[in-house]
């Protein structure tokens, strides 16, 4: 293992000379504050801005930045003339001015040519200018109010490609694939053959399908009426990742055909498609492994196919492997046959009808533990040395599978269900039908090092992926615009099932926290409806965000709470039965609900107000005698009138639930539907207070006008437990969000949380810590150290009793243990009580034992963070990182390492993860987010992202969740106009596709909101905090 030394690494000067060092109002000049910033510019050598860090899989011969930009533009435009870019560039660079500076006199012939060129150029410009609002895009030129007026694409051989759209035509559909693969894990290449059975739905001559990165050696075609194979021409159009097979005869409606393609390709070195992994086992031996990740658009890189979710078909898969390897695919193994080369060919049974993105196969050394569940063999796989960490996953899967089969009243349709821990995997997990793939830390559980939070994570992710076997696999969205039908349902069922089966885990606390954070994102103007039109690969990747997952789940929770659990269950059972093995749209779901509710409620009309518009409502409530006056408007985090005026038409159908002091809370809850801008609810008696949005089951924020907030604050101080812990957390969230936009004074928010001295539940305390930590971070990053210290002191006084009651053990219920973890992390982060002393004592004992002494798992991260503050502690943690067999423990060490105040170490961590040798690249997003939360790491994280942007988008697809996370994690704490300008300027100099990414627009907006928040509240904080 490579060791770390500070003198090994020189930080680039531009990472020191950050714009944060420029003086501006309310900003500390950090260059003059060595105690706040551990590096002086003169201590480091200059590293040229153009220097490159090699990324695993990119190799040494990388394009320079200009060439990368040029090639990116070529791909974006999709025009054949861009293929000549290098030639154009070479000829241009051949021009040099005469040494003597003189100009030669042009000949008459040259003048004539020049005049001709000018006339042609002027003519072209006039034609373009006179075109009626023509916009050139990846698809071509779209005129206003017209569709499909596209530039005819040119195939790689110079011929016209017969299809110009990103979406495939529907004249031909696949019915069955026979796929044979022979991967070589030494050379990281593979040979493949795919035979596709086709049916013509319309007369056509061309077969358009997806393929990318394949060296196609043979294409043959055969009709059902003729058993003779014919070699056919193939055209390739890489910009849409499509190929066209020109059939030797017209394909007739209703007739069947067979297409066979033989090809070879590289095993990918990214995290997409059929990709390779190299890892080191416990004996320090290098091992090769190959796995797949096809969602959303990568099946086409493993085999030519109709790579859209609506094109469902069956699959027969054969894989040739070494004898010591195991091969897995979606279906049970049918046979294993030795080959002449001394290898083994495994054939798997024909699959059920499914989408291409759900196809999966894995080759490598694995062991498994299995259990039969009503005829389905459930197996959990891991690399051999980690097989002892699969017991929890197997037990959890068995319980969840039985629950889902009973709840949905549909049996799991396959004979086997495999769950595999992949040594290097970007996504958290993937729901491939019958072959679920996971990161090791989201499937494996080590009793000695995994905390209660780790246990909840593994349990929830298994629940999520199992729910997909029905929502997504059995019933699939037609196109990626309705991704929320897959992810929203799986996320909802994740929390619902865990709450039913593992009630002691209190998963509702996590769901509540997820809803709070999702609403912060959804309130932004850069948000989007969860059902949104998408076309390009970047737009599709961007749909995999917290809105598709958690807003989708939140809307289903709201609907279940409004209709009742019985009606909700009946409707989804009907939905699954009616659309099994089909591809559907949102309307199909709402039609199932309407069928169950009859004429009592138009669910489709109600829910479209939530799925087809972005954002959510702010409901203002006013008590007036025995009346509740209600008014709805869109919630905006900004008070800027120009933004609010543009969205005055928003209207939601809002389930209004409420409790009051006039009734017993556990017995009384009233619900009505607010489907207009304002309405009145008549109460049976006059009340002192009202709490709207009971248990925060509705997806909206509530403002209590006039004395409404004061009445609730008084009640919390008298007796907070008349409200549930969900409602108390909901009030804390709502009042801080409203204070942020100026609806209520910030001091009122702090008055509300004064009751926390008497709070014993996790959800309200963790929400208060989250809200106050946001304020602390903004103050700290601007250098307001005295003010941020006074804020910590105030919060500490509220929670002092709870902190002093904590023990450094793993005792108590899961909720109590998570509260202990949160409180002690807060106390140690700010050196409160004797927290640092206790953590240091535990760390020193652990270090003295060479890492063999057990630590309480729930406080392990806090102990490691305190230990990492010293040079000796940091280096010891780093030395232990690679030798640890538990991914849960490694993640805790990595978070501690990335929390250092030493910029050299932080930069080295990010660089090492990008390289992928010592720290896997899958961890880079976690490292950047952690560094970005620190002071002064937030400056370093952004500079690192800027310096390595091209490498990042090569490794992680543009628009992917990882890129979204990296952009947000490196910019979300900026709150100055200087930094806003810097971030804007950087992305404006990237491609148009990059600039238009929602995560980029969100970054601009978040910084602007941070600036507004500080302008609105800094003076107030200074006066009374």
Curated annotation (Swiss-Prot):
MF terms (GO), sorted A to Z: aminopeptidase activity; metalloaminopeptidase activity; peptide binding; zinc ion binding
Binding-site residues for substrate, renumbered to this chain: 295, 428-432
Chief place where the protein resides: membrane
Topology of this chain in the membrane: Single-pass type II membrane protein
CDD domains xref list: M1_APN-Q_like
Name this polypeptide is given: Leucyl-cystinyl aminopeptidase
Tissue-specificity statement: Highly expressed in heart, brain, spleen, lung, kidney and white adipose tissue. Detected at lower levels in skeletal muscle and liver.
Biological role stated in the UniProt entry: Release of an N-terminal amino acid, cleave before cysteine, leucine as well as other amino acids. Degrades peptide hormones such as oxytocin, vasopressin and angiotensin III, and plays a role in maintaining homeostasis during pregnancy. May be involved in the inactivation of neuronal peptides in the brain. Cleaves Met-enkephalin and dynorphin. Binds angiotensin IV and may be the angiotensin IV receptor in the brain.
Organism: Rattus norvegicus
Record site feature (Transition state stabilizer), residues: 549
Transmembrane helix is among the record's keywords: yes
Residue positions where Phosphotyrosine is found in the record: 70
